[in-house]
């Protein structure tokens, strides 16, 4: 029955990678054959140069021509394979680029969808209000820091030159007082109570009448 109806081919189609590798392998085989033919041509060339013109040399030339024809055939086949491989590489690159583009577009669509969902929870007015509030708080904090860092200054009336002059005059007054006799000095303000009883030179209390007699 299989001979009449055949068998369905369920094998998967080769991929571009597989086809490219296969052609690359065949190109390698062609290169080996071409290199081998080049070695034969070199050998025939030496024989032709070493042989005198005549039937023997002509026979060697005929063999060399056949080898050269075979080499040309392999080179044409190799060039065709190289062109096919280049086209397949271009197709592979274009296919991969399209896949990358599809993946990128899909990811961007999902990203846009996620952004729309997240933006529903954010309002620009709320962001502006928050920024204004933060700026106000920072300004207020700066004012507090400036107030705390303010230096305490002496009144403007206390000039340094005036203080220096006062200090010099105080020194002169102190020197004058030190050199002046005690009886010429201005009496100091009494510190005792006038109604308090007086005492004599021995420390004994003096009566009021006695005090009047002394006066």
From Swiss-Prot:
Against InterPro entries, the record matches this protein to: Snf7_fam
Q: Which GO terms describe its cellular component?
A: endosome membrane; multivesicular body
* Pfam families reported in the protein's UniProt record: Snf7
| Tagged with keyword Transport | yes
User: Which residue stretches, if any, does this entry annotate as coiled coil?
Assistant: 29-81
What is the membrane topology noted in the UniProt record heading this document? Peripheral membrane protein
Q: Polar residues composition bias: which ranges?
A: 188-199
- Coarsely, its chief localization is membrane
For region Disordered, the annotated ranges are: 186-215
List the GO biological process terms: late endosome to vacuole transport via multivesicular body sorting pathway; protein transport; vesicle budding from membrane
Alphabetically sorted, this entry's keywords are:
Coiled coil, Endosome, Membrane, Protein transport, Transport
**Location of this chain's protein in the cell:** Endosome membrane
Task: Tell me which PANTHER family the record gives.
Answer: CHARGED MULTIVESICULAR BODY PROTEIN (PTHR22761), CHARGED MULTIVESICULAR BODY PROTEIN 5 (PTHR22761:SF12)
Q: How does it assemble?
A: Probable peripherally associated component of the endosomal sorting required for transport complex III (ESCRT-III).
User: According to its UniProt entry, what is the function of this protein?
Assistant: Probable peripherally associated component of the endosomal sorting required for transport complex III (ESCRT-III) which is involved in multivesicular bodies (MVBs) formation and sorting of endosomal cargo proteins into MVBs. MVBs contain intraluminal vesicles (ILVs) that are generated by invagination and scission from the limiting membrane of the endosome and are delivered to lysosomes enabling degradation of membrane proteins.
Stated family: Belongs to the SNF7 family.
Q: Identify this protein by name.
A: Charged multivesicular body protein 5
Name the source organism: Dictyostelium discoideum
């Amino acid at each position: 029955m299989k001979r009449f109806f055949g068998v369905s081919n369920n094998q998967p189609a080769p991929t571009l990678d597989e086809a490219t590798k296969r052609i690359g392998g065949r190109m390698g085989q062609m290169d080996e054959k071409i290199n081998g033919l080049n070695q034969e041509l070199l050998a025939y060339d030496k024989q032709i140069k070493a042989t005198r013109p005549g039937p023997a040399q002509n026979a060697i030339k005929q063999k060399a021509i056949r080898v050269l024809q075979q080499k040309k055939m392999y080179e044409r086949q190799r060039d065709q394979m190289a062109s096919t491989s280049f086209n397949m590489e271009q197709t592979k690159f274009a296919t991969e680029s399209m896949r990358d583009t599809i993946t990128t577009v899909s990811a961007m669509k999902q990203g846009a969808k996620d952004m729309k969902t997240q933006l529903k929870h954010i309002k620009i007015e709320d962001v502006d209000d928050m920024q204004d509030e933060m700026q106000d708080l920072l300004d207020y904090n700066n004012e507090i820091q400036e107030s705390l860092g303010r230096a305490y200054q002496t009144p403007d009336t206390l000039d340094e030159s005036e203080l220096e002059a006062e200090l010099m005059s105080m020194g002169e007054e102190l020197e004058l007082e030190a050199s002046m006799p005690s009886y010429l000095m201005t009496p100091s303000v009494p510190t005792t109570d006038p109604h308090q009883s007086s005492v004599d030179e021995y420390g004994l209390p003096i009566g009021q009448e006695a005090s009047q007699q002394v006066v």
